[in-house]
Amino acid sequence: MERASVGTLLISVAFLAMLACSIALVSGLFGTLHPAFDSFSHFRVHLAVLMALCALPLLATTFRLQAAVALHFAVAAFATTSGSLSFSRLWPVQAAYEAKNEDRAIYKLLQMNLRYDNPTPKKVLSLIGRTNPDVITLDEVSAMWATALGYISSAYPYRILCPYPNGIFGVALLSRRPFAAGTEARCERRGAMATATVDFGGIEVDVAAIHLSWPWPREQYWQIGELTEPLSALGETAIMAGDCNAAPWSAAVRRVAALGGLTVMPSAGPTWIHIKLPDFLRRFAGLPIDQVFSKGGVTIHSATRLEDTGSDHLPVMVEFSLRLNQQKPLDEHETATAAISQTGKTPG
């Protein structure tokens, strides 16, 4: 009798959990109606998996019909994220990135949320030195980081740091390549976005770093509205990266992309999890909230999550090329990270 009561209780708990997950999933699909709904969308993958796990044992109970419907819904909800996550590359028809063109230079952008109180800044500086990116977009640039980044000023002399009012969530943009002549790097008034026009050997590209606040009930929705002007001011060819605190399929990220006339890059995978949890769990069950956007002549070729550097976010390395009519002029001082495939003999 007691065993039957326990079984009934477990079935009831599983059914209620399945129902709660379904309500949250449905709410997340209506993120454009209100930011409160969009807050559920960031957990769509987790909710879909949890609902499926709750539904499976219910298939052997009187709730089998409801469980079957829930399983189908979980699969459908999960499928809505497949075009945004890296596992979509398992299917050739959904290949996420374009193949490299041997006639174009390949550049590297490193996106990092540094974490304002990172106890291991040397790991960050070491990673930058080893990977040698052309441009770097940084989030959570606190006063501590403003000092630490000074150690690589000779390697990255072109830079702009934009402080946030709380002194913690600022952004920064560092470049090995010069900012375009006659242009000026600029900060959004509250330090949530930094923009500079970078000269890639004669081709000018707007590069931006962005850091959004947390979703509703925090200020993310209103903050995106405040960023309308700098986003819409991005040039015809641009690349932007940052911690959006939002999943790539969310209404928030789609809104950012629409304001800037940008395309969201398929995610490299989960990049964030609570700082106390292990790295292997972050790579498997974290949230994919570090995004890269592009438009115009920028072609994205790859995106890779790098090793842990003491932050609650993983760094993301992006390889891209410029798809313009005029290829950049030959330059004997071409940066080491721009790999140009040459045929014939080298200049003498």
Predicted region positions:
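Small-residue packing motifs within transmembrane alpha-helices
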Residues: 10-18, 66, 70-73
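Short, flexible segments with low predicted structural confidence
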Residues: 11-12, 19, 100, 146, ...
